[in-house]
């Protein structure tokens, strides 16, 4: 038996401001194979909105749009008491001594997910930097797999499949009271 998921652009998915995560619970608690239909890089859903300034790519107010936003499409930095916490940490696994980058300002290159400090001091307790999911379209899937510690499979053609498909949207609306 297989559980199929279709990303539909839910901005709350694994976002720290939204503790209620029914799809995450579904994936973690299923004993079925999980298949996610990936975002196609060439679809009509652009990663930037009309009128967006290209050079705002690294600003926290302008994360890229995507079919499968995860963590709000930003890396979250929390710092205080001499410690720095990064979520998702996947991008920074090579850092062995976080104290060397504590209270530093972070940014990234335009294309790809090469994050670096610009050397400027940043004492804000919380800040975020958008990550690139457009030029790395499978990145949300890898982040999800890394976060949940579950094996995810990537599907590529749902038209031939006859099993039940669970859309993220359907799962969320079943668990939310949307009455006005």
Task: Please place each PLM-identified region on the residue numbering.
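Conserved serine DD-peptidase/penicillin-binding transpeptidase domain
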Residues: 2-180
């Amino acid at each position: 038996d297989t559980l199929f998921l279709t990303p539909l652009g839910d901005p709350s998915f694994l976002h720290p401001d939204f503790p209620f995560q029914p799809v995450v619970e579904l994936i973690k608690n299923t004993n079925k194979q999980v298949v996610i239909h990936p975002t196609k890089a060439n679809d009509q859903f652009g990663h930037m909105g009309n009128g967006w300034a290209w050079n705002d790519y690294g600003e926290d107010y302008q994360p890229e749009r995507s079919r499968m936003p995860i963590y709000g499409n930003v890396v979250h930095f929390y710092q205080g008491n001499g410690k720095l916490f990064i979520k998702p940490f996947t991008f920074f696994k090579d850092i062995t001594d976080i104290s060397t980058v504590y209270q530093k300002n972070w940014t990234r290159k335009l294309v790809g997910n090469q994050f670096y400090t610009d050397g400027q001091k940043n004492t804000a307790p919380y800040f975020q930097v958008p990550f690139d999911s457009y030029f790395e379209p499978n990145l949300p899937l890898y982040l999800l797999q890394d976060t949940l510690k579950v094996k995810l499979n990537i599907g590529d053609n749902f038209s031939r499949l006859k099993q039940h498909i669970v859309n993220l949207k359907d799962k969320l609306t079943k668990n939310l009271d949307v009455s006005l």
